[in-house]
Design a protein with these regions (language model features):
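Residue-level signal for inorganic ion chemistry
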Residues: 17, 41, 68, 107, ...
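Conserved donor sugar-nucleotide recognition element shared by glycan-biosynthetic enzymes
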Residues: 21, 25, 71, 100, ...
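Gly/Ser/Thr-rich active-site cleft segment
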Residues: 87-169
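Short, charged, surface-exposed secondary-structure boundary motifs
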Residues: 9-12, 73-77, 148-150
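Short beta-strand-loop/turn "lid" adjacent to the catalytic site in phosphate-handling enzymes
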Residues: 30-66, 94-98, 125, 129-150
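N-terminal glycine/serine-rich phosphate-binding loop of ATP-dependent small-molecule kinases
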Residues: 1-62, 89, 117
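Short alpha-helix plus adjacent loop in nuclease-associated cores
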Residues: 64, 68-81
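Hydrophobic or amphipathic alpha-helical targeting/insertion segments
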Residues: 55-59, 77-82, 86
Length: 169
């Protein structure tokens, strides 16, 4: 099942149309069921983009696309808390201005209420998994693209998250 996946621009911000994408995912499942029982399914999308959820697991705002310009100069903001070389040495992830670490800094700087309100964050494929199953999980390899994972412990780098002033939840 193929469908177009064009971002939507509203007031100068580029968003993913996750409602449309989820509708299309469900359409694909309906089509696949015509061929028999679905034994398993995986969800794979792009990395770095995420959805914030509130205490009722409702989405806070829309998913901003990594191509959006909101992360311009957010690397400098992050480096006020941790030097670039130290960040790379800590995470082993190549700097890309659209990495989640910079996107979260943009949210912190431009829409701080969203981070305060958020009770959880799911990467886009994990969000679709949640919508289909009701289970919140973070797939490790995708989580590493956030630049917030400790490659030694293979878990969130809580010290780094605290250093940046991001919520632990």
């Amino acid at each position: 099942h193929r469908f177009s996946n064009d971002p939507v621009i509203v007031n100068g911000t580029m968003y993913w149309d996750t409602l449309r994408q989820f509708f299309e995912i469900k359409q694909g499942i309906v089509k696949a069921k015509k061929y028999g029982i679905i034994d398993s399914m995986g969800i794979d999308t792009w990395a770095v983009d995420f959805v914030l959820l509130d205490e009722n697991d409702e989405r806070i705002g829309d998913a901003v696309a990594y191509r959006d310009r909101r992360t311009e100069d957010m690397d400098r903001k992050v480096y006020e808390f941790i030097p670039e070389d130290d960040l790379y040495g800590r995470t082993g992830i190549q700097k890309q201005i659209f990495n989640t670490i910079y996107q979260l800094m943009a949210v912190k700087e431009q829409q701080p209420g969203q981070l305060e309100w958020a009770k959880s964050m799911l990467m886009i494929p994990d969000y679709f998994h949640f919508l289909l199953t009701g289970k919140k999980v973070q797939e490790y390899t995708n989580a590493t693209t956030t630049q917030l994972v400790n490659p030694v412990t293979k878990d969130w780098d809580i010290e780094l998250i605290d250093m940046l002033g991001y919520p632990r939840r």
